[in-house]
Swiss-Prot record:
Family: Belongs to the FHIPEP (flagella/HR/invasion proteins export pore) family.
GO cellular component labels: plasma membrane
Protein's UniProt name: Flagellar biosynthesis protein FlhA
Transmembrane regions listed in the UniProt entry: 49-69, 71-91, 96-116, 146-166, 234-254, 272-292, 316-336
Membrane topology recorded in Swiss-Prot or TrEMBL: Multi-pass membrane protein
Job description of the protein: Required for formation of the rod structure of the flagellar apparatus. May constitute the export apparatus of flagellin. The flagellum is required to cause a persistent disease in a murine model of infection.
Composition skew (Basic and acidic residues), residue ranges: 361-381
Source organism: Brucella melitensis biotype 1 (strain ATCC 23456 / CCUG 17765 / NCTC 10094 / 16M)
Gene Ontology biological process terms, A to Z: bacterial-type flagellum assembly; protein secretion
Length: 723
């Protein structure tokens, strides 16, 4: 995964590679602990369910006051309505996979309340109609109208509807659904395996489908058994009501001295009221079970499925409306309800096609828009795949995970490095992409410029680096190595010896600093490649009005914009800042009418920039100089081939002399490099570019100046000569 560092003004390190994976794993572990604390010790949902079951069992055996019965019966009705609403709104049956368990709890709750009300009715029924509570009395008055015969009829109808219609149908649907689901499991499993083998789905999707298939078979199997709860509940309600009526009459007549008619009136009303209070929630739950099992494979909530499918055929609605109008004009039938319903159906039958037409147009427009967006996205993705990052830092798995703790510091220091480059060299380097690359060794990193690897190194995770130079090796255990940025002698030591090294006077460098120093030097060595044509035009657009006129005078009359870019690149290739762009343009304006080659133009520009060059390369106002000896100066001068006009056209040197020069120059330069000295190599103006090409292959960071590039007033300190 890729992460962008160094974006001005701020940078963030984000991604899904190993750097982000370790962080995500920590976040997951932290998040996993939170529900455990809140769910188990604060909300107490699991304890609440256990307490509820215990209360249900307690009601079976202990006498309950009428007030508590009222609360329990009201809760039973509310719980049943909640179950029905959930069954109506779920998108698919598996979304309510806990329904069998809920059904068992609801059935057990109603039976326990039934037993509790039976105990109260038989014990205190002689005290009057309010002996069993206000809920039972209210149902007996409201539903029965004060007549127990009406109550018996209504109760019988509820039992028949619940037992013979809803419950029996739901039971049959559950049986068939369970059988067909179990029979289809092998075929569905084979289909999942086939899709996985063909690559249509990945392993994660296959596991999800298998888990869903397992849940589906378990759900329908449970529903097949759970439907028996509803059926048994209806039978138990009928038997309990009959026992209440006959038992109440006997107890009232024999124990409480009531006459038969009075006992029959009181106990029948209370028993039938009790039966209605328990059978209505049972009917509601049976309806929810029927809705759930009859939903089948239909997607969406029940209202969406019903109204969507009934309203999908406008002709059927219009024909039904016509039939209602005909019934409305028939003699003896009331016209108003039939005309009202017929008009409503006719309105829906006419409005639905228009709405469907508008919806089809909107869908077609949306589909066209999505298709255009998909095509545009595909074109952009192809373009993006062709683009390469200008600067890319690839990290091995272990190294990227190790740097997670310092990602903010990494982003801050990269930002700081980009700002420093902008101030030092006069243009903003591109953003640096950080990539987790599992193909790299775990502790290694690789630096790419324009998609091409230019440097790599393996860090010692858990160790620090001591740059030695000419100093002896520290007394602590470690291993002598070369630091990657400059190739200087260094000593790698475990982090535990940091304090010991500081006591001995050694400066320590951590892995992040080693990496960023190496990255910084690689960027310096490739500044010319990083200055794009776009960057150059941005610099030119920032010029003031007076220098815009100068630019118009020289471009494109004497030098093209690409030629101007070549001059700037040649300067940056030798780490010469282009921040004084106006001075560069003035120098080009002086020489461009006379010469065309960028190599010749840049030598004149360097001479005009001598003050800046020496100022940037001097150390506390002193320019340390390593000269090219007279012998080698003569060799290089004789290797320059000129044409009739005296212009240099070729550099031809004997390979043996070139090899000898490389050996002698390396020895002299390495000596001063190991001492940590900052210096420049000085040669003749004509040979300077060619000597620079040779030295660059040996010491890329060593500046090579000509005699004319040493500005007046600069204090020069000679370090000797290559002779």
């Amino acid at each position: 995964m890729k992460q962008t560092l160094g974006a001005v003004p701020a940078a963030r390190l984000t991604g899904t590679g190993p750097m982000s994976v370790a962080k995500q794993e920590a976040d997951v572990q932290q998040a996993a602990a939170k529900p455990f604390i809140k769910g188990k010790f604060l909300t107490g949902s699991d304890i609440g369910l256990a307490v509820g079951i215990i209360i249900i069992l307690t009601v079976l055996f202990l006498p309950v006051p009428a007030v508590v019965l009222d609360i329990g019966l009201a809760f039973s009705i509310a719980f049943s309505v909640l179950i029905l609403m959930v069954a109506l709104w779920i998108q698919r049956p598996l979304d309510f996979s806990a329904f069998p368990t809920v059904l068992l709890i609801a059935t057990m709750m109603r039976l326990s309340l039934n037993i509790a009300t039976t105990r109260v009715i038989l014990t205190h029924g002689n005290e009057g109609y309010l002996a069993a509570g206000h809920v039972i009395h209210g149902f007996s008055q409201f539903v029965m109208g004060g007549d127990f015969v009406i109550g018996l009829v209504v109760f019988a109808i509820l039992i028949i509807v619940n037992f013979l219609v809803i419950t029996k149908g739901a039971t049959r649907i559950a049986e068939v659904g369970a059988r067909f689901t179990l029979d289809a499991i092998p075929g569905k499993q084979m289909a999942i395996d086939a899709d996985l083998s063909s690559g249509l789905i990945d392993e994660k999707e296959a596991q999800r489908r298998r888990r869903e298939l397992e849940e589906e078979s378990s759900f329908f199997g449970s529903m097949d058994g759970a439907s028996k709860f509803v059926r048994g509940d209806a039978i138990a309600g009928l038997i309990i009501t009959a026992v209440n009526i006959f038992g109440g009459i006997v107890i009232g007549a024999t124990r409480h001295g009531m006459d038969i008619s009075q006992a029959a009136d009181v106990f029948t009303k209370l028993s039938v009221g009790d039966g209605l209070v328990t059978q209505i929630p049972a009917l509601i739950v049976s309806l929810a079970a029927g809705l759930l099992v009859s939903k089948g494979g239909t997607r969406g909530s029940a209202d969406q499925a019903i109204f969507g499918q009934l309203g999908a055929y406008p002709k059927a609605l219009l024909i039904a409306a016509l039939l209602l109008f005909i019934l409305g004009v028939m003699p003896g039938l009331p016209a108003f309800p039939f005309f009202l319903l017929g008009g409503a159906m006719a309105f829906v039958g006419i409005a639905v096609p228009r709405r469907q037409a508008r919806q089809r147009e909107a869908d077609a427009a949306e589909a066209g828009k999505k298709q255009r967006e998909a095509e545009e996205q595909e074109r952009n993705s192809v373009k993006a795949s062709l683009e390469t990052n200008q600067i890319e830092l690839c990290l091995g798995k272990q190294l990227s995970a190790r740097l997670i703790a310092s990602q903010e510091e990494l982003a801050h220091r990269v930002n700081k490095m980009r700002r420093k480059f902008a101030q030092e060299y006069g243009f903003v380097i591109p953003e640096i992409k950080v990539t987790d690359d599992i193909a790299l060794p775990p502790k290694s990193y690789r630096i790419k410029i324009h998609g091409t690897a230019v440097a790599s190194h393996e860090l010692r995770v858990g160790e620090i680096l001591v740059v030695l130079g000419e100093r002896p090796v520290p007394s602590v255990p470690g291993e002598e190595v070369r630091e990657p940025a400059f190739g200087m002698r260094a000593y790698s030591v475990p982090e535990t010896f940091t304090a010991d090294l500081r006591r001995e006077g050694y400066m320590t460098v951590d892995n992040l600093s080693v990496l960023l120093t190496h990255l910084s030097e690689i960027v310096r060595n490739n500044l010319a490649q990083l200055l794009s044509y776009k960057d150059m035009r941005i610099l030119l657009d920032r010029l003031g009005p007076e220098y815009r006129k100068l630019l118009e005078d020289i471009c494109p009359a004497h030098i093209s914009y690409s030629g101007l870019q070549a001059v700037l690149k040649l300067l940056l290739a030798e780490r010469i800042s282009i921040r004084n762009l106006h001075l560069i343009l003035e120098a080009i304006a002086e020489i461009a009418p006379l010469v065309r080659r960028p190599e010749m133009i840049v030598e004149h520009v360097r001479m005009r920039m001598a003050q800046q060059i020496c100022g940037d390369l001097s150390d506390n106002g002193v320019l340390n100089v390593l000269r090219l000896g007279n012998r080698w100066d003569l060799v290089f001068h004789q290797s320059l081939k000129r044409d009739a006009k005296g212009e240099i056209v070729e550099f031809d040197i004997d390979p043996r002399l070139l090899e000898q020069f490389g050996t002698e120059a390396s020895a002299a330069i390495r000596k001063h490099f190991d001492n940590g000295e900052r210096f420049v190599l000085v040669s003749s103006p004509e040979a300077r570019p060619y000597i620079r090409m040779i030295i660059e292959r040996l010491f890329a960071t060593l500046p090579v100046l000509s005699h004319v590039e040493i500005a007046r007033g600069v204090e020069v300190k000679s370090l000797g000569a290559i002779s």
